[in-house]
């Protein structure tokens, strides 16, 4: 528990985060507090810096300025111990799942334990089997990722992420390229296992309906700045001009896609 908010401890505190590429600003002073044990989603149009933000938090990218604190401890560039501890207590789910096709389901899940712990082979096997059992994947232990459906591959990626028993799991566009039914299923899966394993989930996505149905809090990123932070209910009625524009655009896109799928409308391929 941190001393910042005793009634709602803050798992992750980001202050003034900045990042540029070729002198073009992508993040312009991002401030966020992610409550412990919550599902917190960062929304925004494509190209607004959501994935860059998440990769800065994960230490995949180095921010140009700003502070990131995890469990009250600053992850400063020179504090190797703090960063190592963060890596032990955090997992990252890549947009592509980043599964190894030459490894079985069981071997994929075992990989982070083999790389980051001193556990023996028997204990690693026990933990992996336990994680796969809890995610209802026991029957797939000896299969390879290519033999699984897209949804099962996503579940495998989550099993690998939670096998280290992380306190924070970062999700980078977890439903990219999926149809609405599978998007709903992925967000439902995240919500189910977040409750089961009690980790804090930080998600970046542009899928508004799914995020609002699943998240405890949402933030909206606009041109590298946070335009809104609040509950899904507050987001749905916000008068903030950019929130309204983004919300209406997402709704219009959803209605257009529904018409195309039903055959009531067509789309030109340019």
Region spans (language model):
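A short, proline-enriched helix->beta-strand linker immediately N-terminal to the Walker B motif
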Residues: 163-167
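Conserved ABC ATPase "signature" region
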Residues: 74, 121-140
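ABC ATPase NBD coupling module
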Residues: 75-91, 121, 235-238
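Helix N-cap at the start of a conserved alpha-helix in ABC-type nucleotide-binding domains
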Residues: 180-182
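Helix-to-loop junction immediately C-terminal to a conserved catalytic motif
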Residues: 58
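Conserved ABC ATPase signature
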Residues: 144-148, 152
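Catalytic Walker B motif of ABC-type/P-loop ATPase nucleotide-binding domains
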Residues: 169-172
């Amino acid at each position: 528990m941190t001393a910042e908010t005793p009634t709602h401890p803050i798992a992750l505190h980001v202050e003034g985060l900045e990042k540029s590429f070729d002198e073009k600003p992508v993040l312009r002073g991002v401030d966020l507090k992610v409550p412990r044990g919550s599902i917190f989603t960062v929304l925004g149009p494509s190209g607004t810096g959501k994935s860059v933000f998440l990769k800065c938090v994960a230490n995949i990218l180095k921010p140009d300025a700003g502070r990131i604190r995890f469990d009250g401890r600053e992850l400063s560039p020179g504090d190797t111990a703090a960063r190592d501890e963060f890596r032990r207590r955090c997992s990252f789910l890549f947009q592509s799942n980043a599964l190894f096709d030459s490894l079985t389901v069981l071997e994929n899940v075992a990989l982070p334990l083999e790389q980051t712990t001193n556990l023996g082979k028997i204990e690693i096997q026990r933990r992996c089997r336990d994680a796969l059992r809890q995610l209802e994947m026991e029957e797939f232990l000896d299969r390879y990722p290519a033999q699984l459906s897209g949804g099962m591959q996503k579940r495998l990626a989550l099993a690998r992420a939670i096998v280290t028993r992380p306190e924070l799991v970062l999700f980078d566009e977890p439903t990219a390229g999926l149809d609405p039914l599978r998007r709903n299923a992925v967000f439902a899966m995240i919500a189910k296992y977040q409750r089961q394993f009690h980790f804090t989930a930080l998600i970046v996505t542009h899928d508004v309906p799914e995020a609002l149905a699943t998240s405890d809090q949402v933030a909206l990123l606009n041109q590298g700045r946070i335009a809104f932070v609040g509950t899904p209910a507050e987001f749905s009625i916000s008068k903030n001009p950019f929130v309204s524009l983004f919300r209406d655009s997402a709704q219009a896109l959803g209605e257009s896609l529904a018409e195309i799928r039903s055959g009531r409308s067509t789309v030109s391929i340019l």
